[in-house]
Swiss-Prot record:
Molecular function GO labels: large ribosomal subunit rRNA binding; structural constituent of ribosome
SUPFAM superfamilies linked to this entry: Ribosomal L11/L12e N-terminal domain, Ribosomal protein L11, C-terminal domain
Source organism of the structure: Levilactobacillus brevis (strain ATCC 367 / BCRC 12310 / CIP 105137 / JCM 1170 / LMG 11437 / NCIMB 947 / NCTC 947)
Subunit and partners: Part of the ribosomal stalk of the 50S ribosomal subunit. Interacts with L10 and the large rRNA to form the base of the stalk. L10 forms an elongated spine to which L12 dimers bind in a sequential fashion forming a multimeric L10(L12)X complex.
Protein name: Large ribosomal subunit protein uL11
Function: Forms part of the ribosomal stalk which helps the ribosome interact with GTP-bound translation factors.
Length: 141
């Protein structure tokens, strides 16, 4: 018989930098997870994605064992990296802060494809373009 899921914890943690310190430690402690076991496994799995924020979904079972799924970095993080800026615009409709090309958008859409509910790459590109516009980025090309 399959183990019964007791809790699901969703976090966004910098790749390879999970520590027992807040906010990771308290969130995992409340769920009853072995914090050191999770941090070691997460850091090992995400070591190749250094510098990115990685969303993770942790399933905690009734016997306090756990497993987790790492997702692709958020579209906003990938867009900021592609544009070379720290953050988006506070007034995206009037104040444009950066420009991304269609090629960059396509590359981000292909990266995010497994986590998006898009039928094809073109639909995923439209989603990423919408995120870019809402951050005050101009899409060229």
């Amino acid at each position: 018989m399959a183990k019964k899921v007791a809790n699901v914890v969703k976090l966004q943690i910098p790749a390879g930098k999970a520590t027992p310190a807040p906010p990771v430690g308290p969130a995992l402690g409340q769920a009853g997870i072995n914090i050191m076991g999770f941090t070691k496994e997460f850091n090992a799995r995400t070591a190749d994605q250094a510098g990115m924020i990685i969303p993770v979904v942790i399933s905690v079972y009734e016997d306090r064992s756990f497993d987790f799924i790492t997702k692709t970095p958020p579209a906003a993080t990938l867009l900021k990296k592609a544009a070379g800026v720290e953050h988006g615009s506070g007034e995206p409709n009037t104040n444009k802060v950066a420009t991304v090309t269609k090629d960059q958008v396509k590359q981000i859409a292909e990266t995010k494809m497994q986590d998006l509910n898009a039928a094809d790459v073109e639909a995923a590109m439209r989603m990423i373009e919408g995120t870019a516009r809402s951050m005050g980025f101009t899409v060229e090309g």
